[in-house]
């Protein structure tokens, strides 16, 4: 299996050298062209020449996080689509699947990733985290336990955190739109 991976890397490097554009860049261009951005999201590129870094803003219109603006950075490396993009939440938020450092727990960004998935898949997955947080597979175990044991209290603490308040002694970013 390792030999196959090494051969694929060599082939990709040959293709890049021949055309000046890597297979990852070609795939990223296709994914960007195929993006279907709902009204609750917006995208931007810090450098329009380099499509491998994407900024995403999610504005949920329902659920616990309704009314917030959540910013993400999506970084795509040269092994894409064989490796998933790296996604980081740029806001400090109270969420079972996003820790206070901004790391995101989404299965398609880890063990469930495969090369047929694309940027649209990631956007849909991130949006779903805000509509239906998953307490069964958390990064923020306190928030997950809170959601599981006391959904109404969790909702109240999410609102407090979204307004830039303190939850369990931790200060969160004001993300209210």
Swiss-Prot record:
Native organism: Schizosaccharomyces pombe (strain 972 / ATCC 24843) (Fission yeast)
Example of a GO cellular component annotation carried by this entry: cytosol
EC number: 2.3.2.34
An individual GO BP term: protein neddylation
The UBC core domain, residue ranges: 23-167
Active site feature: 105 (glycyl thioester intermediate)
Catalysed transformations (reactions): [E1 NEDD8-activating enzyme]-S-[NEDD8 protein]-yl-L-cysteine + [E2 NEDD8-conjugating enzyme]-L-cysteine = [E1 NEDD8-activating enzyme]-L-cysteine + [E2 NEDD8-conjugating enzyme]-S-[NEDD8-protein]-yl-L-cysteine
Keywords assigned by UniProt, alphabetized: ATP-binding, Nucleotide-binding, Transferase, Ubl conjugation pathway
CDD domains: UBCc_UBE2F_UBE2M
Transmembrane segments: none
Protein function: Accepts the ubiquitin-like protein NEDD8/RUB1 from the UBA3-ULA1 E1 complex and catalyzes its covalent attachment to other proteins.
Pathway this chain belongs to: Protein modification; protein neddylation
Protein name: NEDD8-conjugating enzyme ubc12
Signal peptide: none
Encoding gene (name): ubc12
Family: Belongs to the ubiquitin-conjugating enzyme family. UBC12 subfamily.
GO molecular function (one): NEDD8 transferase activity
A Pfam cross-reference name: UQ_con
InterPro entries listed in its UniProt record: UBQ-conjugat_E2_core (IPR000608), UBQ-conjugating_AS (IPR023313), UBQ-conjugating_enzyme/RWD (IPR016135)
């Amino acid at each position: 299996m390792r030999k196959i991976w090494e051969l694929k890397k060599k082939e990709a490097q040959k293709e890049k050298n021949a055309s000046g554009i890597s297979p990852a860049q070609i795939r990223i261009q296709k994914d960007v062209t195929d993006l279907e951005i709902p009204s609750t999201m917006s995208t931007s590129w810090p450098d329009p020449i380099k499509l491998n870094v994407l900024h995403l803003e999610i504005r949920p219109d329902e659920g616990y996080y309704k009314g917030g603006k959540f910013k993400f950075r999506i970084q795509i490396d040269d092994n894409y689509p064989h490796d998933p993009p790296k996604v980081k939440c740029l806001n400090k938020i109270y969420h079972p699947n996003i820790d206070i450092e901004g790391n995101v727990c989404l299965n398609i960004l880890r063990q469930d990733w495969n090369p047929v998935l694309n940027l649209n898949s990631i956007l849909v997955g991130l949006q779903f985290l805000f509509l239906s947080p998953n307490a069964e597979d958390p990064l923020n175990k306190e928030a997950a336990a809170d959601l599981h044991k006391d959904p109404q209290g969790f909702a109240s603490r999410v609102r407090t955190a979204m307004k830039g308040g303190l939850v369990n002694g931790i200060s969160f970013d004001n993300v209210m739109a």
